[in-house]
Amino acid sequence: MNGEIRRAKIENILKSSAVPVPGVTLAKDLDVSRQIIVSDIALLRANGL
């Protein structure tokens, strides 16, 4: 899965969740490391999420 698709999925998960979603959970669900999730969330925040 490329980064753009992964970040779109992260954005959808975060926006649809009523509670905070741990990075470890996102990493497991998307089959990437937690550090990749941290980097993706930083990019999403920089772009206004």
Region locations from a protein language model:
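Short, Lys/Arg-enriched C-terminal cap helix and immediately downstream tail that follows
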Residues: G48-L49
